[in-house]
From Swiss-Prot:
Manner of cofactor binding, per the entry note: Binds 1 FMN per subunit.
InterPro entries named in the record: Pyridox_Oxase (IPR000659), Pyridox_Oxase_CS (IPR019740), Pyridox_Oxase_N (IPR011576), Pyridoxamine_oxidase_dimer_C (IPR019576), Split_barrel_FMN-bd (IPR012349)
The reaction(s) this protein catalyses: pyridoxamine 5'-phosphate + O2 + H2O = pyridoxal 5'-phosphate + H2O2 + NH4(+); pyridoxine 5'-phosphate + O2 = pyridoxal 5'-phosphate + H2O2
Protein name: Pyridoxine/pyridoxamine 5'-phosphate oxidase
EC class of the enzyme, as a word: oxidoreductase
Chain residues that bind substrate: R9, K10, D11, Y12, K67, Y124, R128, S132, R192, L193, H194
Organism: Nostoc punctiforme (strain ATCC 29133 / PCC 73102)
Pathway membership, UniProt: Cofactor metabolism; pyridoxal 5'-phosphate salvage; pyridoxal 5'-phosphate from pyridoxamine 5'-phosphate: step 1/1; Cofactor metabolism; pyridoxal 5'-phosphate salvage; pyridoxal 5'-phosphate from pyridoxine 5'-phosphate: step 1/1
Domain of life of the source: Bacteria
Length: 214
């Protein structure tokens, strides 16, 4: 008999998450978990859901790639004219979610968003493969197009334009940083009694840790 969606379930049994074991600094704790995801050779451990919302409350979400993190926040790069770029310009609040299934772990981050510096955007752009740099010029992200041929034609045009020369960063393309006000670490546990530890940023810049009911 075929399973239905309602029949799909997994019991989480790997390990727990204790207030006594986590770091008091959520960025250090994130790095610990991220390094373990890297060591476990998880596919694209830097993939994260980015949720945004319009000023009138219409939400949208998509997968993006984390490209830098430190105590300033979590950075990704995009076309500023895209839907997410426009929504964040109008309402600079966002949520991120990392899901590392093999480790039975989730990290949820909420905060406000700022552009990274021009220098940071330039430095990251210069590390991208040439075709990816061209792609930043080719795609008017989130706009309706007639067919894929539109992209392929524009790709050839920009390839010819920048052949044998440096490809500059488009002014509409760069980095955004989510500066967290809260970070939740979730560890799957048996019987759906999961461990959830929430770090909340206080006015003095320190963090408090609360355990949440699953």
């Amino acid at each position: 008999m075929d399973k239905t969606v309602a029949d799909l379930r997994k019991d989480y049994t790997l390990e727990g998450l204790s207030e006594l074991e986590v770091d008091l600094n959520p960025f250090i704790q994130f790095k610990k978990w991220f390094d373990q995801a890297l060591a476990g050779q998880l596919p694209e451990p830097n993939a994260m859901t980015l949720a945004t919302v319009t000023p009138d409350g219409k939400p949208s979400a998509r997968m993006v790639l984390l490209k830098d993190f430190d105590e300033r926040g979590f950075a990704f790069f995009t076309n500023y004219n895209s839907r997410k770029g426009q929504e964040l310009a109008e309402n600079p609040l966002a949520a991120l979610v990392f899901w590392w299934a093999e480790l039975e772990r989730q990290v949820r981050i909420c905060g406000y968003v700022e552009k990274v510096s021009e220098t940071e955007s330039d430095q990251y752009f210069d590390t991208r493969p040439p075709n990816s740099r061209l792609g930043a010029w080719v795609s008017n992200q989130s706009e309706v197009i007639e067919s894929r041929e539109v992209l392929e034609r524009r790709m050839q045009e920009f390839y010819s334009k920048y052949e044998n020369q440096e490809i500059p960063r488009p002014p509409h393309w760069g980095g955004l940083r989510v500066i967290p006000t809260e970070i939740e670490f979730w560890q799957g546990r048996s019987s759906r009694l999961h461990d959830r530890l929430l770090y909340s940023r206080l006015d003095n810049g320190t963090w408090k840790i609360d355990r949440l009911s699953p």
